[in-house]
Amino acid sequence: IFLSLTNKNIKDSKNIISAGINASSQIKTIMKFKKINNINKTIFLIPNSDFKEEIENAISESKIKLKYTHIYEINPTELTKQIEEITMYKIRKQNIIDEIKRLENSNEQNKEKKINRLKKRDTLGGINFDSVIVSDFEESLKSVFTSLLYTDVSPQRVYYITLNQWFDESFLKEESLQPLYFPSINKENFDEFINYYKKIYNENPNQLSF
C-alpha cells in the first residue's frame, strides 16, 4: 500500500491511498451545505485549465444536482463577456433604462423619487440561479468573482461557493466577497496547530507539515 499526498483522484489504483482533500470530497461537502440551506438552483463554473477534467469527473461521481455547468476561459476579457451572458447582464441593464424611461413618461405619483432610486441601481430584474460554485484558485478565482460583482450579482443575492481556500487568507479579507463559502478544516483547530508548531519549531508551518 502506498500513501500519496496528492489531492487528485488516482483511477484504477487499489493500492494507493490519496491523503489530500480532493475535488470529489469537497463537492460532497458542498452538497450537504446545499441541502441544509435549501439551495436548489446552482450553477458550476469550471475554468478551461489543466484540472478541468478532474472537476468534471468529480461532479459526475458525486451526482450533485446543478442547474448547469459552464466552462469559462481564464482570459479576463473573455471571462467578463461569458459572465455577462451567464448573468443576463445586458438584459437586466436594459431593463433599468426602460423602466426609468417609462416612469419619466408616466403620471405616477412620486415618480421622481422612484426614478432617483432606480438611478442608484445598475440593473433591474431577477437572476435565474441562487448559488454559484467556482472551481478556481488565487487571482483567477478573484477575477471570476470580480466579474460577478461587475454584473451586479453580489454574495448578498446568491451564494458564492468555491473549493478549499483555507490557506489563502486574502479571500477572507475581501469584504466585497463576503459571505464566501468553501469546504475547510476546523479553523480553531488549525490556529491551535499553528501556535503549537511555532512553539516547538520557532517557525510557521507549511501545508505539508499540516
Task: Tell where the protein language model's regions lie, with residue ranges.
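Structural motif
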Residues: 5, 20-22, 45-50, 71-74, ...
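Extracytoplasmic ligand/sensor domains, especially the bilobed periplasmic-binding protein
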Residues: 1-45, 49-65, 69
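Short beta-strand elements in bilobed, periplasmic/extracellular small-molecule ligand-binding domains
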Residues: 12-16, 44, 62-108
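Sec/Tat-exported extracytoplasmic proteins
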Residues: 34-41, 46, 59-63, 87-90, ...
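Short, well-structured alpha-helical segments in soluble
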Residues: 32-36, 82-95, 99, 116-125
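Extracellular/periplasmic periplasmic-binding protein-like sensory domains
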Residues: 64-66, 84-93, 103-106, 110-111, ...
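Short, charged, surface-exposed secondary-structure boundary motifs
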Residues: 10-16, 29, 78-79, 169-173, ...
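Stable alpha-helical elements in mature extracytoplasmic
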Residues: 26, 30, 51-58, 75, ...
